[in-house]
Structures are given as structure tokens and as C-alpha cells.
Amino acid sequence: MRLVLFLNMGGAMNLQDCEVFLKNMFNDPYILGIKNRFLRKFVAWIITKARVKAMQENYKKMGGKSPLNELTQSLCDKLNLKQDEFKFDFVNLYVPPFATEILQKYTLNENDEIILFPLYPHHSCTTVTSSLEILQDEISKQKIQAKVKTIDIFYKNKLYNEMIVSHILAKKNKFDAKILIFSAHSLPQSIIDKGDLYEKHVKDHVEILKEKLKDHFDEFILAYQSKLGPVKWLEPNTSDVLANLNDKALIYPISFCIDCSETIFELGMEYKHLAKCDYDLISCPNDSDEFAQFILKYLSDLN
């Protein structure tokens, strides 16, 4: 068996999951950065209690759940129907399904292979490194003898970028904007200052896409969303960019592969009240045929 596991932070499937998500996320040493495990757990508890009600209210506006799990499951189902060389499944870091239960579903031996595929096109210790460490620890804990391969960044991949360009232009045909905003999930500047490659990868990716789209837009803007707390984060903020727009725009969520609360609620709903001009949101790759095609080609090229 060649088991491909997509890795993501996960999205709450109900309002009760919001507390689970926050508690696990802020207890991740790559997120909070407090080395002492007991102190980190205590601080995570305080932050969770302070934020959970607001998160639940946001989720109510999305129908009470994130679309991330269902879209990822749909992507796995589509890929499993298209071929029989790989078996596709997914693991979340902060809400179910967790690594323990997913790995226990399969009987694996030394002739099998596990391919860990974080659904993040750009590298960050807060996403890719954290995901891979948790999975590799669980594989070791369960004494699984299968060979393990890992996928890292894929933002430079030609097929992946052709898909993005296609999705952007398809939306532009329906909403003719001259400004394209690339919105990436922000990170604290302190993480970047320690050598995290995320900002560099995102900027490189924007340059690749600008070159492919230069004949279709007059202006390209890279902005960062989802800032949290009083510390310095990557700038400019997407909300500030929208508040100062002088013409309508399209937004592409460049750091996301699957739609989640940050895209559906934050970009699609919350920022609408802040925007000076009208804008439209382009969906993530999600379970599209083009994304499935990219994944299969990418995996076949690994061999």
C-alpha cells in the first residue's frame, strides 16, 4: 500500500470543536513558542477561554462549522476513485481526525509506504514542520515499519500555478477587476526573524504569478490576514488594504489550499464591512479536478 496522508490544521465541525481547536493550537510549541510545557498549557487555556465565544459566533455565521474537513474528504474520495496506486486520507493537527485514529485504520508493514503531504504550498515551522513532526512521532509511537516520504513546498510547481491562474481568470471573467490582492495568512515578525522561510516563499510565489498574470491586471498587492494579539505581524494587513482600495478587486488566498474559516468568514464576510470598494473572493483549489490532477502528477514525479 502507498498511503498518502494530507496534513492540515483542521477546521471545527461544530461549535464545541472551537474550544478543542484553540486549546490544541495554542498548546503547539511552534505556534505559541513557550518552551515550558506546563506554562504553555496554562497560557493556551487562558487564550482559549478569552477567544472561544468570539470564534463560535463567527462559526455560527458560516452555518456552525468549517468546510475544511468535508472538502478535504471530497478531495480524497475523488483521488481514490481516479486511480488505485495510492490510497488517500487526511489528518488534522488540532481537531479530529487526529493522527492516532487515522494511522490505526491501516495495517502497514515494511513493504508499504506512507507519504506525508502537508497542504501548505509554502514552508513554515508553524505549519509544515509542526505537521510532519506530529505525524512522524505518531508513526514511531505505533511502531509502524512502513517507509515514510515527506512532501514539502510546491509553490514553484508549473501545474499548480497553471491551475491558480486558470481559477483567477475564470473569476475575472465574471467580476472584471483590475486589482488582484494575494492574501496570505500572517505570521508574527518574530518567527520570521528567527529564520522561518514563509515570507520569502510567499513573495517568490507572488512574483511567479504576477509574471503569468501581468497582461490581465493593472495592480498586484500582497497582504497578510488573521493577525492576532498585540505583537508585530507581517504587513500590510489585508483588512487595511481593503479599507483603502480605490477600485474593485479580486482576492486570491495564496497560502491556503482548502477553504476554511479564514477564507469563508474572514475574507468572504468579515472584511466586506471594512472594504471601501467592492471585491470578490476566489475559491481555494479545494476538491477541484485541476487540484486532483496536480496532486497525482506531483506524486508520480516523486518515483
Swiss-Prot record:
InterPro entries: Ferrochelatase, Ferrochelatase_AS, Ferrochelatase_C, Ferrochelatase_N. GO terms for biological process: heme biosynthetic process. It holds the Pfam family Ferrochelatase. This is Ferrochelatase. GO terms for cellular component: cytoplasm. It is found in: Cytoplasm. SUPFAM superfamilies: Chelatase (SSF53800). It comes from Campylobacter jejuni subsp. doylei (strain ATCC BAA-1458 / RM4099 / 269.97). It catalyses: heme b + 2 H(+) = protoporphyrin IX + Fe(2+). Its EC number is 4.98.1.1. Catalyzes the ferrous insertion into protoporphyrin IX. GO terms for molecular function: ferrochelatase activity; metal ion binding. Keywords: Cytoplasm, Heme biosynthesis, Iron, Lyase, Metal-binding, Porphyrin biosynthesis. Fe cation binds at H185, E262. The keyword Metal-binding applies. Transmembrane segments: none annotated. Pathway: Porphyrin-containing compound metabolism; protoheme biosynthesis; protoheme from protoporphyrin-IX: step 1/1. Its main location: cytoplasm. It is an enzyme of class 4 (lyase).
